[in-house]
Amino acid sequence: MDIHRLPALADNYIFLLHDRQRNQAAVVDPAEAKPVLDCLETLGADLVTIYNTHHHGDHVGANRELLAKYPNLEVYGGVEDQGRIPGQTVFLRDGDRLSFADREATVYFVPGHTRGHIAYYFAPGSGETIGDLFCGDTIFAGGCGRLFEGTPAQMVQSIGKLRQLPDQTRLWCAHEYTLGNLKFALTVDPSNKDLQERFQTVQGDRQRGQATIPSWLGTEKRTNPFLRWDNPAIQARVGMTEPARVFGKLRGMKDNF
């Protein structure tokens, strides 16, 4: 399965999955149609599936236009988003399984950013060691999504599920927010050597106009404060230890950063 990262809008990424054997494609969170259609034309592939992580317009904005061109599309989304994702045909629950391009995927229900948010984890293919996590706006490289419809306790539970996945998991989040996220992370975890090194690398990447996505889940576990609510240094920094309170404090600080 080839994964094509397609820039969209101001800072979104759309991900197009290509099954070369069958010459079929699936798209994750199509914010707009043109990048998807251009990529499909280049590949000469047929679009068969949309995977939506949640209902926000910058993740489902192209659903209707793509359905107009490919009326037999299956549109996947969480069952809690029924009526909020245009054209949705498949209503997923936590633990559901699906497959694309001979890769098996598990659905994770991860409320917090929105009440119906889901993530898709594609386990490594045969003979491979790297998995792929499409997490929408739940985890960002160096950060996490705002809590529009959920609570800190929900987000701790949701991210807690995802951080149990292997370190050798590529994290395909939907926005290029990494540099700003790491600037904030350094204010709450300033002695973290891995974080300091990552910031320098990302700063150089962005100065050269390079994308920072995908990230690695192992990197997030070491450097992303929103996966480190149980780290003693971060707990000391915010003056509390209960996971939801630590997370809520971090999120509030980031909202005002």
Swiss-Prot record:
Keywords: Hydrolase, Metal-binding, Zinc. This is Hydroxyacylglutathione hydrolase. The keyword Hydrolase applies. It comes from Synechocystis sp. (strain ATCC 27184 / PCC 6803 / Kazusa). Zn(2+) 2 binds at D58, H59, D137, H175. Its EC number is 3.1.2.6. Pathway: Secondary metabolite metabolism; methylglyoxal degradation; (R)-lactate from methylglyoxal: step 2/2. One of its GO terms (molecular function) is metal ion binding.
